Design a protein with these regions (language model features):
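Glycine-rich phosphate-binding active-site loops on the catalytic face of alpha/beta enzymes
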Residues: 91-104, 179-188, 238-256
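Conserved anion-binding
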Residues: 93-174, 269-283
Length: 286
């Protein structure tokens, strides 16, 4: 069974860094893995993306090639099925959206852990399979397989009013490793749609972080730029997921397109010396 880089870092008390993709193109995962070793995992935000079971297998292969862990974000109605298939494809962490109750939280843990007595990290319902994670038929049903399910990282979204109201009881469910506050959904659930900076939203986020840290659960924060991490680091947060592929591309196309249109519609100016133009052209390909 493949070592779980994210689990190893969590158990060692080390900080972790991930990034999000909505694309199922495996090359993106390889590029992230080749980005200087800075990323511990890739979150495939499947809640918002179209994908097939074959896509999950191919992403799993790319994760192995890149030497990084994979996390998948799944929607509420698909907890068990998508978690099971993603882990079988080679993902080693599952982020569960829309948790509201203790029973929801128990369902999240059960969708990941092995159905065997004595689990270190919560009750499970997952059985033996013949999938990529076990080499199809090489390690299925082995003690190493059950241990790998026990090591899979279970993450829940705290993003609903009901979840925040039940937060203490939810976080006491055995087997939850990490929490992620979702300001957009939470603001909607309290009637402040789109107002992520509302005082009640900030209060709920702080409550989530403090409640998690109190229990030894790891709070994770999603950011777009490194400069946003500082206030959270001061609170004790060590786990971040930075950037989304769609956001990176959208921002590039918008800003670069705007700049180019400005250049193309600007009044003609005196051309630069030939040597300078040639140098600029060469720089493009460096």
């Amino acid at each position: 069974m493949r070592a779980n880089r994210l689990r190893q870092k969590l158990d060692a008390g080390l900080p972790t860094l991930g990034t999000h993709i909505l694309s199922t193109w495996p090359t993106l995962v390889e590029l992230i893995g080749a980005a200087g070793g800075h990323y511990d995992y890739v979150e495939f935000t499947a809640e918002y993306a179209p994908f097939t079971m074959h896509d999950l297998d191919n992403l799993g292969r790319a994760l192995e090639l890149g030497g990084i862990a994979g996390m998948i974000k799944v929607e509420q109605s698909e907890y068990t099925h998508q978690a099971m298939r993603a882990i079988g494809s080679g993902f080693q962490s599952v982020l569960f959206a829309d948790v509201r109750t203790v029973e929801d939280a128990k369902s999240c843990v059960a969708a990941v852990r092995a159905e065997t007595p004595g689990n270190r990290r919560g009750f499970g319902l997952t059985g033996v399979g013949m999938r990529r994670d076990v080499g199809t038929n090489r390690e299925g049903g082995s003690p190493a397989y059950a241990a790998a399910l026990d090591d899979a990282v279970v993450v829940i979204m705290v993003e609903k009013r009901q979840c925040v109201e039940n937060l203490d009881a939810i976080l006491d469910v055995p087997g939850i490793d990490m929490v992620q506050f979702g300001g957009s959904d939470y603001s909607m659930s309290i009637g402040q749609t789109g107002n992520r900076t509302h005082a009640d939203v900030r209060k709920a986020e702080l409550k989530t972080i403090e409640a998690a840290l109190k229990r030894g659960i790891h709070p994770r924060v999603e950011i777009a730029e490194p400069e946003q991490a500082g206030p959270y680091i001061e609170l004790g947060v060590k786990h971040f997921c930075i950037g989304w592929d769609v956001g990176i591309l959208s921002n590039f196309w918008r800003t670069r397109g705007e700049t180019m249109q400005g250049l193309l519609t600007a009044p003609a100016s005196k051309p630069k010396a030939k040597s300078q133009s040639a140098k600029a052209a060469q720089d493009i390909y460096r």
